Design a protein with these regions (language model features):
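Extracellular/periplasmic helix-exit of transmembrane alpha-helices
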Residues: 208-222, 276-315, 386-390
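Hydrophobic, membrane-embedded alpha-helices of multi-pass small-molecule transporters
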Residues: 47-64, 206-215, 225-289, 329-341
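Extracellular loop-to-transmembrane helix junctions
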Residues: 2-19, 72-102, 111, 122, ...
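Membrane-interface loop-to-helix entry segments
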Residues: 5, 9-27, 129, 145-149, ...
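Loop-to-transmembrane helix boundary motifs in multi-pass membrane proteins
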Residues: 120-124, 161-169, 277-286, 294-297, ...
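Hydrophobic alpha-helical segments and their helix-loop junctions in multi-pass secondary transporters
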Residues: 138-142, 146-157, 162-166, 174-179, ...
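Helix-loop-helix module between adjacent transmembrane segments
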Residues: 10-11, 15, 56, 90-106, ...
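Membrane-interface "cap" regions at the ends of multi-pass membrane proteins
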Residues: 10-66, 240, 270
């Protein structure tokens, strides 16, 4: 329990100390935000701060801080330390700069910003990667909540394949509506209800877990290295922990969500609460579910091997909350987490493609032109992943590492932004290089031979993969420093204002 409480303290203190430091480095001021300087009535719409905070939390907190940490706590008590440290030093920094740099550049997404800060060549790679990843997010966050609907806790003995597909259809229809209509008409109105349910569900699971905190494992200071070898299947912490637990530590998906809220904020000075603070809250949610996961694995060790995250979640909830109405509320809360990330992932994809094609989104026709093909592709992936016995596992694995590559892209933008302004760029560069190392190591090492059920990778020897990944991270870090310095010397360059000269005139110029 002591290790768990230390982790919680790191998160809370981190917000008030390191979060304040990061805010000072950026330097929010009184300039007009996109919602006030260039409103469009669809995406750049002024909204109250409390709504923005709630929307940001619901957008970023998908199933990662629940199912991801339930699976990730298999690595042992070290998770209670690495999760909050990674959150404060990496994830919250990532989310803050994703939102604030976007706010300074008319609310543009990372692919558009990468044209400005990284160059046209890298931007094409970023655009491809993020588009694919967002489609995968939409598919994963449709299938998982539908599977949670189709559990005994919610439907008793009526669990069936038909019910699962009905749930998929209903969720997918909602996604279309929330992607297509103006943000204040659907998301801005329904999210307060979702937020209230999420808060109640989080409190319920926390109250259910508190009496069992005394069974939690502790970090072993007498034998430090033993903390790195706790996984029952022998998975190495590097890179597997940081791929398994994305949301909670750092998640590239968040960089696609922060710009959505950057378009609706009315002042830069609330950015730390909205972007940095909500990542801290997600970390706290992750800590609660990690504690629950460790408890249920102690009670039922058989769940450590073979049980899916959804299965472990169902058993945990029914065990710590035996009263049916409350256990139903908790599962509904988890479903909300998934749905409120799935809807905005597809909305973000629509905006990303629109920015890079120049299609104005005030037109109903233009929104349909982008939304319909996106949803058709996502539907095909959902159908395939559920018809193939290994389909969802394959989908989840590719989503996991592509999600972390998105984090690298966003941190690259943040590093160059800060370097070009001659500010402390190390706060973004260090987590950027670390996540580059993690994702490169994962891709180079992972394979069905090296890790059961893993996607195809290069399958290199573990130590060889580590060395190459370290070199990759160093090379990227050098490039970012050089790029940032060169931009700082470029005549007419302004990191805080969109400059059409750096683009191919395919992105609508900020007004």
């Amino acid at each position: 329990m002591i290790t768990f409480l230390i982790g919680v303290a790191i998160l809370i203190l981190g917000y008030f100390t390191y979060g304040k430091f990061v805010e000072r480095v950026f330097g929010p001021d009184d300039r007009k935000t996109p919602a006030l300087a260039n409103p469009d009535g669809v995406d750049r719409v002024p909204m109250p701060h409390w709504k923005n905070v709630l929307i940001q939390l619901l957008n970023i907190a998908g199933i990662g801080p629940v199912i991801g940490v339930i699976l990730g706590i298999k690595f042992g008590a070290i998770v209670f330390i690495l999760l909050p440290l990674g959150n404060v030093l990496g994830g919250a920094v990532h989310d803050y700069f994703s939102g604030m740099i976007s706010m300074r550049n008319n609310g543009y997404n990372v692919p558009a910003l990468s044209r400005k800060f990284l160059g046209k060549g890298p931007a094409k790679l970023v655009m491809t990667l993020i588009s694919v990843a967002l489609i995968l997010v939409g598919a994963v966050f449709t299938t998982t909540p539908a599977a949670l609907v189709n559990t005994p806790i919610l439907v008793g003995s009526h669990v069936s394949q038909t019910l699962f597909w009905v749930a998929v259809a209903v969720i997918f229809a909602y996604y279309f509506i929330s992607t297509f209509f103006p943000i204040d008409k659907i998301i801005g109105r329904i999210y307060p209800v979702f937020g209230a349910l999420l808060i109640l569900a989080s409190l319920a699971i926390f109250i259910g877990i508190v009496p069992n905190l005394n069974v939690l494992d502790e970090f072993c200071f007498a034998d430090i290295m033993s903390n790195f070898h706790k996984h029952p299947a022998g998975q190495p912490i590097i890179p597997m922990l940081f791929v398994t637990i994305a949301c909670g530590i750092i998640s590239g998906f968040h960089s696609t969500q922060s710009p959505l809220v950057a378009r609706t904020e009315v002042t830069e000075k609330t950015g730390r609460q909205t972007f940095y603070g909500m990542m801290i809250i997600e970390g706290l949610i992750g800590m609660i579910w990690a504690a629950g996961g460790m408890f249920i694995y102690h009670q039922m060790p058989e769940l450590l091997t073979g049980a899916s995250g959804v299965k472990v979640l169902s058993v945990l909830v029914s065990t710590v909350i035996p009263w049916a109405p409350i256990s139903i509320l908790v599962v509904v809360g988890v479903i909300i987490l998934a749905i409120t990330s799935g809807d905005t992932s597809l909305r973000s994809l629509r905006l990303t493609v629109a920015e890079l094609t120049g299609l104005e989104q005030t037109s109903v026709k233009n929104r349909l032109l982008l939304t319909v093909p996106m949803f058709a592709l996502c539907a095909v992936i959902i159908f395939w992943s559920n018809m193939n016995p290994e389909g969802f596992n394959i989908l989840w694995n590719y989503f996991s590492w592509s999600n972390q590559l998105m984090a690298v892209c966003s941190l690259c933008v943040a590093t160059v932004y800060l370097r070009s302004k001659k500010k402390n760029f190390w706060i973004a560069l260090i987590p950027c290089m670390f996540m580059t190392f993690i994702t490169a190591d994962y891709i180079l090492w992972v394979s069905p031979e090296n890790l059961k059920g893993a996607p195809l990778g290069f399958g290199l020897d573990y130590k060889t993969a580590l060395v190459i990944a370290l070199h990759d991270a160093a090379i990227l870090g050098f490039f970012l420093c050089v790029r940032g310095k060169s931009l700082s010397q470029m005549e007419g360059y302004d990191a805080d204002r969109w400059n059409s000269a750096l683009d191919e005139n395919k992105i609508p110029k900020a007004q």
